[in-house]
Structures are given as structure tokens and as C-alpha cells.
């Protein structure tokens, strides 16, 4: 495998890094944005999920658009949209402006998640396709790691006395820092060639051969040229592809396989874990600072097991990874469900006396009351303190009130993340890049990715 091929695959997959960074950063941002704009739970949910809804739109059209204009041009547009989203998010002055900014980012990652594995599959050989397409998932989890690390340090140095890093503007820095990897992505894409398979489809044979020679060397390039010509000749026997062609009996089985894997990936709840990681860890009662640092642990486990997946995917095969991983996911989620179901919530009088925030004395009448679930407890807190005051101090309150087997829950969460990272995470994108004939690839992957994003929303 050439260094050139690795470099190109990594650069193209940087859209995945930005997706992971955006998805991870929002878990910490909402701790500040909620009180800043006095958002309801529904509005918080929309700010978090807005990119997923926008991504669905991009997923419908980006594959087809890249078939016409080329993968590289659309990827450049993706990088530009990421940069715009980061700037607008950092300077958002209203809830509506922040939502719009995040939807622009959603358009970017919706297209990036489809086009990166598609492009990599078109420049790689059969022997290394699995590991190269998995770089997309590696970049996603590296993005999560960078986001949780960023959140941790911004939260650590946030102070009411600090001019720039205080509760009113620290979230702007969290969102705005995404601009730097977005610009790097945009500039790096200029060093990426156009897809040789796409060039062949557009009858640009000389440029396609030049690209293959640069990537694989002359000897291997000849073999890849022959493979591309055969696959394209076969595709040209078919009529111009239409959306309805996906329903053909010859494609039905592979469409069902892709859709099942796409749905399964999201019904595990993986995005909810990442989007609300800080809130979930707070709910275990470990405190705000520990919740932010636990996010680093979570993303570190993800990175480690993604590397394991990349090592095994072309050796053990796709199917064994899926079977073992989904079994582990099921067991881990059962552990989490049991742990949270046994949790109770109770504030003691001495806890309330230690609170120094506004209206904390209003909690004295409920001292000693035990709540059997977090929903009732949180609603009571919001009624007594108000939504804004509770949102600013929820970590402190939950740390004092929560009685839970935190170790069991943490084992469940980390087990779930580990099993997902070496199975459904990377394997889905590898499967999608291999399942469909090149003529149908843009539409087919777009449909599966649309359904995948819809489930996550």
C-alpha cells in the first residue's frame, strides 16, 4: 500500500473527523447554551439533532450530484460548508441562528459521510479496500476524541472572572474552534486527485490512467485500469440509472442488506451516547468536571477499538465482526438499562446547605424526599429552581442526589462503545462501498445513508 494512497484516503476522510468533532463538541456546548438562550428541553433537542435532519437532505442528492460533477468538487463544497457552519455557530446571537448554523454543518457531514467511502472504494484495490474505507470511521472517532478533549480544557479553564472564557462565551469558543480543521480539510483537498473511476465514466481516460499511476505505480495501475474498464463496460450495458432502478429484483437483496445494517447501526443509540455524553455521565452522579473527563475516556476507547477493527476487517472478514460486535452491544446496553433502572435520587439537608447557587434554599422543604427516576427528580428541580438555574447547576445537584451503581453503568457504556467501534461503526461503510455496482453506488448509498440519518434523528 503506497503512502500516496494512505494520504489521499486520510484527507478525503477528514470530513468524518469534522462530523465526529461536531457531534462530540455539542455534548459540552449544551451545558452552556441552554441557560444562555433559556432553551426548553425541546429546543435543546432540536439544536442537537438539527444537523441530522439537514444531513438527510444532503444524503439524498450528494451521491447523484457527485456522479455529475465529481467527488472532489462536492467534497470541496463540504469543507466550505463546515467552515461557514463553525463561524455562524460561534457568532450566533439567537436560538434560530444557532439552529441554522448547525443545519449548514449537517448538509456538510451528510455529504461527507457518503462521498468519502465512495471515493476511497474507487481508488483502492480489493486487498486494502476494507482498511482504507475504515479510515473514515477512524477519523470520526478521532474527531470525537478531539472534541471531548477540547470540551474538557475549555470547561477546566472556564471562570466567571475570565474575560473570554466564562459561562456566557465559552461555548462560542467550543464551536468556533471547528473552523481550523475545516480550513485544513479545504486546503488539503487540493492535493487530492479526481476519482479515476469517475474520470473513466466521463471518458477522461488519460487523466484516469495518470491518477492510477500516481497512486499504485505503473504495474499495479494496469491491473486496476483493466478492472475499471470491465466494471464500467458491464454498467454501460444498462440504461441510464434512475431512482426507481433501485427497486429492481437484481438489486433488491443488496438494498435490503444495506438498509438493515444502516438501521441497526442507529437503533443501537450510538449518536445519543455521543451527543449527550456529558449529560449521561452527569446523571451517574460523578459531577460536571468528571463528566467532561469521562468523555475523553469514552473517545479513547473508541479510537483503540477502531484500530482493532481496521486490523481485523480484511483478516477476519466483515460478517464475524458484525456478529460479535452486535452481541456485545446488546449485553452492554442491558447492563446500562439495569443500572439506570435501579437509580434513586435524594437530596439531604447537608447537601443543600453546601449549595451556593441562587434559590438553593428553596430546596430545603424536599430534603429527604426520594425519587425513583430521574425524570420526576429533574422536573421537581426545574419547578423549584427554574429551568435556567437548574441547567447551570445540574451537575452539582445530580452529583449530590444520585444513588446509582456508577461502575456498572460505566462498564456498560464503555463496553457498548468498544463493541460498536469494531463492528457496526466501520463495517457499515465498508459494506456500502462494496455492495453496489458503480453505476448505482451514488443513489444506493444515498438512500441507505438517508435512512440511517433519519433513524438517528
Cite the ranges covered by each PLM segment:
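Transmembrane-helix signature of 12-pass secondary carriers
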Residues: 1-457
Amino acid at each position: 500500500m503506497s503512502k500516496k494512497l494512505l494520504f489521499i484516503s486520510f484527507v478525503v476522510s477528514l470530513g468524518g473527523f469534522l462530523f465526529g468533532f461536531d457531534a462530540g463538541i455539542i455534548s459540552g456546548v449544551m451545558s452552556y447554551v441552554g441557560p444562555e438562550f433559556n432553551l426548553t428541553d425541546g429546543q435543546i433537542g432540536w439544536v442537537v439533532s438539527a444537523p441530522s435532519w439537514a444531513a438527510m437532505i444532503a444524503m439524498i442528492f450528494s451521491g447523484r450530484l457527485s456522479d455529475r460533477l465529481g467527488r472532489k468538487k462536492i467534497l470541496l463544497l463540504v469543507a466550505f460548508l463546515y467552515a461557514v457552519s463553525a463561524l455562524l455557530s460561534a457568532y450566533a446571537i439567537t436560538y434560530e441562528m444557532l439552529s441554522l448554523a448547525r443545519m449548514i454543518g449537517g448538509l456538510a457531514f451528510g455529504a461527507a459521510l457518503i462521498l468519502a467511502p465512495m471515493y476511497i472504494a474507487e481508488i483502492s484495490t480489493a486487498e486494502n479496500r476494507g482498511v482504507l474505507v475504515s479510515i473514515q470511521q477512524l477519523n470520526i472517532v478521532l474527531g470525537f476524541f478531539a472534541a471531548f478533549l477540547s470540551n474538557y480544557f475549555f470547561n477546566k479553564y472556564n471562570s466567571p472572572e475570565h474575560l473570554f472564557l466564562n459561562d456566557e462565551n465559552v461555548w462560542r469558543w467550543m464551536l468556533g474552534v471547528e473552523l481550523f480543521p475545516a480550513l485544513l480539510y479545504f486546503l488539503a483537498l487540493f492535493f487530492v486527485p479526481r476519482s479515476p473511476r469517475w474520470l473513466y465514466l466521463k471518458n477522461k481516460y488519460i487523466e484516469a490512467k495518470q491518477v492510477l499511476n500516481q497512486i499504485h505505480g505503473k504495474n499495479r495501475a494496469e491491473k486496476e485500469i483493466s478492472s475499471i474498464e470491465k466494471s464500467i463496460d458491464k454498467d454501460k450495458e444498462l440504461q441510464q440509472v434512475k431512482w426507481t432502478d433501485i427497486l429492481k429484483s437484481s438489486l433488491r437483496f443488496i438494498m435490503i442488506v444495506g438498509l438493515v445494517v444502516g438501521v441497526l447501526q442507529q437503533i443501537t443509540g450510538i449518536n445519543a451516547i455521543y451527543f449527550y455524553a456529558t449529560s449521561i455521565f452527569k446523571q451517574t452522579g460523578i459531577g460536571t468536571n468528571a463528566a467532561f473527563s469521562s468523555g475523553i475516556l469514552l473517545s479513547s476507547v473508541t479510537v483503540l477499538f477502531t484500530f482493532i477493527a481496521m486490523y481485523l476487517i480484511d483478516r477476519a472478514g466483515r460478517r464475524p465482526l458484525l456478529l460479535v460486535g452486535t452481541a456485545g452491544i446488546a449485553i452492554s446496553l442491558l447492563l446500562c438499562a439495569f443500572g439506570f433502572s435501579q437509580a434513586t435520587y435524594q437530596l439531604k439537608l447537608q447537601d443543600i446547605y453546601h449549595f451556593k447557587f441562587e434559590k438553593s434554599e428553596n430546596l430545603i422543604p424536599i430534603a429527604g424526599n426520594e425519587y425513583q427516576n430521574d425524570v420526576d427528580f429533574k422536573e421537581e428541580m426545574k419547578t423549584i429552581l427554574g429551568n435556567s438555574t437548574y441547567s447551570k447547576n445540574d451537575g452539582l445537584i445530580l452529583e449530590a442526589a444520585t444513588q446509582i451503581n456508577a461502575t456498572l453503568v460505566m462498564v456498560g457504556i464503555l463496553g457498548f462503545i468498544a463493541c460498536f467501534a469494531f463492528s457496526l461503526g466501520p463495517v457499515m461503510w465498508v459494506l456500502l462501498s462494496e455492495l453496489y455496482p458503480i453505476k448505482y453506488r451514488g443513489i444506493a448509498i444515498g438512500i441507505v445513508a438517508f435512512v440511517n440519518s433519519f433513524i438517528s434523528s
